[in-house]
């Protein structure tokens, strides 16, 4: 199963995903996060190949010409994209995958795949979003205001998703994310594929 996770900048999405991957009890089955390619500069603390693959605009556009991306979008004048090969190599091993992408990428994937569930994460208020962006210390006030305006434009698309999480309290939001993924992993359509051999033996 492929899980699309989208949220405006500053909502806490990256922290939630990293916490989810560190959780030992949940989800029930193995899950990995796809590492996207981007043309933006690395931020302090980021590691190439762990947070993103940081490449040039020329390299990115060459990959576009090669139809290498499952999805891609231009956000804040930077490219972001998910390589088709990386996603396929994970899914072929019956491992669930998380895609940290925006609504534009989600729309592209929905058009070509059916094995998808989508989750949209929003902040409890604009004031709280502003506080988080300011606390992050990465942008000037003008850029923060631009990000908030962009966040509103992104949040308009929340009804296009299967699930909605309000990240007011981090631990509650993490629990909600765990619950959604565990429920999907237990869905009949997924379980009968995952345990096809076991079920076949039981019914002989």
From Swiss-Prot:
SMART domains documented for this protein: GuKc
Residues annotated for ATP binding in this entry: 7-14
Nucleotide-binding is among the record's keywords: yes
Main location, first listed in the record: cytoplasm
Record-listed E.C. numbers: 2.7.4.8
Superkingdom of the source species: Bacteria
GO cellular component: cytosol
UniProt GO molecular function: ATP binding; guanylate kinase activity
Sorted UniProt keywords: ATP-binding, Cytoplasm, Kinase, Nucleotide-binding, Transferase
Role this protein plays: Essential for recycling GMP and indirectly, cGMP.
Entry's family note: Belongs to the guanylate kinase family.
Name by which UniProt lists this protein: Guanylate kinase
Protein's organism: Baumannia cicadellinicola subsp. Homalodisca coagulata
Gene: gmk
């Amino acid at each position: 199963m492929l899980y699309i996770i989208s949220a405006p900048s500053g909502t806490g999405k990256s922290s939630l995903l990293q916490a989810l991957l560190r959780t030992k009890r949940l989800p029930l089955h193995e899950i990995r996060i796809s590492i996207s390619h981007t043309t933006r500069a690395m931020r302090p603390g980021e590691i190439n190949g762990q947070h993103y693959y940081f490449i040039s605009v020329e390299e990115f556009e060459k990959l576009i010409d090669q139809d290498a991306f499952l999805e891609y979008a231009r956000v804040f004048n930077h490219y972001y994209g998910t390589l088709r090969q990386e996603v396929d190599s994970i899914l072929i091993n019956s491992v669930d995958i998380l895609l940290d992408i925006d609504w534009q990428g989600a729309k592209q994937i929905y058009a070509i795949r059916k094995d998808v569930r989508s989750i949209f994460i929003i902040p409890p208020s604009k004031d709280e979003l502003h506080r988080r962006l300011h606390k992050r210390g990465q942008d000037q006030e003008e850029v923060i205001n631009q990000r908030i305006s962009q966040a509103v434009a992104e949040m308009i698309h929340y009804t296009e998703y299967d699930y909605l999480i309000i990240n007011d309290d981090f631990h509650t939001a993490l629990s909600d994310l765990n619950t959604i993924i565990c429920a999907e992993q237990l869905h009949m359509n997924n379980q009968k594929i995952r345990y096809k051999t076991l079920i076949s033996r039981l019914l002989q």
